[in-house]
Design a protein with these regions (language model features):
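Active-site microenvironment of metallo-dependent hydrolases
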Residues: 1-44, 48-54, 59, 104-106, ...
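Active-site beta-loop-alpha junctions enriched in small/polar residues
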Residues: 88-90, 116-118, 146-151, 182-185, ...
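Divalent-metal coordination cores built from histidine and acidic residues
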Residues: 2-17, 21-22, 97-208, 273-275, ...
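Residue-level marker for buried hydrophobic side chains located in beta-strands
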Residues: 26, 81-83, 209, 282, ...
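A generic structural signal for well-ordered alpha-helical segments
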Residues: 103, 134, 202-203, 225, ...
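Short coil/turn connectors at secondary-structure junctions
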Residues: 21-23, 65-68, 73-74, 78, ...
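Histidine/acidic residue-rich metal-binding segments in metalloenzymes
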Residues: 126, 161-181, 187-254, 261-282, ...
Length: 597
């Protein structure tokens, strides 16, 4: 906003507050949840003009005009619109527009998004695409410039790369709020010049450096990471993680997404240890479309926090004023107060936290779960829907795992999936060798996992082993949503089904697919960067539900298997991952063999 525009805005708001010109909309007879003071103030009225709040007080009569729209709150709570402190739109497998369409029903009026998924596919032009789409939304969508593309140089090959020069360019763009999660924590604590230059460009622009410390180690490595400059972190899973971060000056982002459930463990720092809640923020990180449609978004997170014993007002603060102050936008959002955007929720019960009306930027956006505004689709360019390039037709032979011996047993390094958590285990187990090959061992839940290069058409396939998916049929599951470089991941019990699954995704331009005994039994097409659908969120959720059902048919009982599948190549979260270059021990940031000689 220019100086002239801001001058005109504040002059107008003053005139409404003084009763000299009428408000566009007033809300009467509500219970004001004043997050800035921690009070609930009854009998409150609010006057709104040009999408902003002009007056909050006991009587708004002096702001009424003949054309003023009057909303009777009926003694319901007036809650600031909810903010998601850290999230990735691409995890919903829908566009920014469709994500907004889904979450606005649940009271989300602002999101801080890190589009490092599309950045790994398209680089800076992919980020620009997301910034442009974010700018035309009916809610606030701030973009963090992705920091680690690739997330681990030398351990993976991305479709694109980003460095200090690109970060410096993006910091000039309107809509860029800061630097996305600094996932290369070894790079930070080992004083890597590129990582520190990116953080320096961000801080020079006066913006926030996002953190990502995915290690359980809280000794000198953690202290070294914090000294490097990251200002928040959402990777904590234990109360001691929250304690350490707050004591070292970081904001603790507690996440409840589709697969990550880290609020209950860390909120104990507030409820049991008496830590100042100002240093805590709620977020989702990754939410699938079916979670958004069937369970909700930030309303779900706030409600969950309340069930963990935190005061409802405090829970709301963690999703409103806290993230707003952290990112430096509290003059615009995060509270119900003059000058701020009129992002207001009407709710009958705080403990239940069921959103009945959503006002976004002064407009009634949703009521009782129904969208009341039109949100036009964003036109994606042709280049954004042609990103999957396998280079050739894959066959069952590409998914063989050749052993160093012709028969007997060998020690194998196996990725161990942990239910509801992002980290994996580095398992070392003996596996059987028959005719020079290692095959899946269904009884012990040892399956094949393959990483298929899909950006440059090299035809390269890396094969390893994984435990935890529980597949017990001749089948395969595959996805091009494969954090962070977003190649293609395939897990299966059958080499031929793994080839069918991979080739199918190559044909449709990306997505997720389940193949059972040679037949496709579930699929969601994701043609935009191989990450997002161009269809409505409800349809994507329906297809995603079909994928989950197909997982179950194949024997998988994980709570959120497609999310766990998508993280098998995330070589910045311990302990063991697979990349297009081999099997990676994340703790050592080095390669290990799948099979020992």
């Amino acid at each position: 906003m220019t100086t002239h525009q801001l001058t005109q805005l504040t002059r107008t708001l003053v005139q409404v507050a003084m009763g000299k010109i009428p408000a566009d909309t007033v809300i009467r007879n509500g219970r004001w949840v004043c997050v800035q003071s921690g009070e609930i103030i009854p009998n409150t009225d609010i006057a709104i003009k040009d999408g902003r709040i002009a007056f909050v007080g006991a009587d708004v009569s002096h702001t009424l005009g003949k054309q003023t729209n009057v909303i009777n709150a009926g003694d319901r709570y007036l809650v600031p619109g909810l903010l998601d402190g850290h999230m990735h739109v691409e995890s919903g497998m829908v566009t920014v527009t469709e994500f907004v369409r889904a979450v606005i029903l649940h009271g989300t009026t602002g999101m801080f998004i890190d589009p490092h998924e599309i950045a790994n596919v398209f680089g800076l032009k992919g980020v620009r695409l997301m910034v442009d789409e974010a700018a035309v939304q009916p809610i606030h969508v701030w973009v963090q410039m992705p920091s680690c593309v690739p997330s681990a140089p030398g351990l993976e090959t991305p479709g694109a790369s980003i460095g200090p020069q690109e970060v410096a360019e993006a910091m000039k763009w309107e809509g860029i709020i800061g630097l996305g999660e600094m996932m290369n924590f070894p790079g930070v604590m080992n004083a890597d010049e590129k990582m520190h230059a990116e953080m320096a460009e961000t801080r020079s622009a006066g913006k926030v450096v996002g953190g990502h410390y995915a290690s359980l180690e809280l000794g000198k490595e953690f202290h070294g990471y914090v000294a490097g400059g990251p200002e928040d972190d959402h990777e904590g899973t234990r109360v001691e993680d929250a304690v350490a971060r707050v004591r070292q000056g970081m904001k603790v982002m507690m996440r409840l997404g589709s697969a990550w459930h880290d609020v209950a463990s860390q909120i104990r720092a507030i409820t049991e240890m008496g830590f100042d809640p100002r240093h805590f923020i709620l977020c989702t990180d990754d939410s699938h479309s079916e979670t958004l449609i069937n369970q909700g978004h930030m309303d779900r997170v706030v409600s969950h926090a309340i069930t963990q014993g935190i005061n409802p007002i405090t829970a709301i603060q963690l999703a409103t004023i806290n993230p707003a102050e952290h990112f430096g936008v509290a003059r615009e959002v995060g509270m119900i107060a003059p000058g701020r955007y009129a992002d207001i929720l009407l709710i009958s019960s705080l403990p239940k936290f069921e959103v009945e009306m959503v006002i976004a930027k002064g407009q009634i956006a949703a009521q009782n779960g129904k969208l009341l505004m039109d949100i036009p689709a964003f036109p994606y360019p042709t280049w954004a829907v042609s990103s999957v390039n396998l280079g050739r037709e894959l066959t069952a032979r590409d998914f063989r795992l050749t052993a160093p011996v012709s028969s007997g047993k060998v020690k194998a390094h196996i990725i161990g999936v942990i239910e509801n958590q992002a980290p994996t285990q580095h398992l070392v187990m003996e596996v059987n060798v028959v005719k020079g090959e290692v095959s899946p061992d269904i009884e012990r839940d040892i399956l094949k996992v393959a990483l298929v290069e899909r950006h440059k058409g090299t035809g390269e396939v890396q094969v390893g082993l994984v435990n935890g998916f529980g597949l017990d049929q001749p089948c395969a599951i595959a996805t091009t949503v494969a954090h962070d470089s977003h190649h293609m991941i395939v897990v299966g019990t059958s080499d031929s089904d793994m080839a069918i699954a991979a080739n199918k995704l190559g044909q449709v331009g990306g997505g997720q697919v389940v193949v059972l005994d040679g037949e496709v039994i579930g699929m969601v097409e994701l043609p935009i960067a191989g990450l997002m659908s161009n269809e409505r969120a409800e349809l994507v959720a329906e297809k995603a539900s079909g994928i989950l059902e197909a997982f179950r048919t194949c024997g998988c009982t994980l709570n959120n298997p497609n999310m766990q599948l998508s993280l098998l190549a995330l070589v910045v979260i311990p302990e063991l991952r697979i990349s297009d270059l081999g099997l990676v021990d994340v703790n050592e940031f080095d390669f290990v063999p799948v099979l020992e000689s």
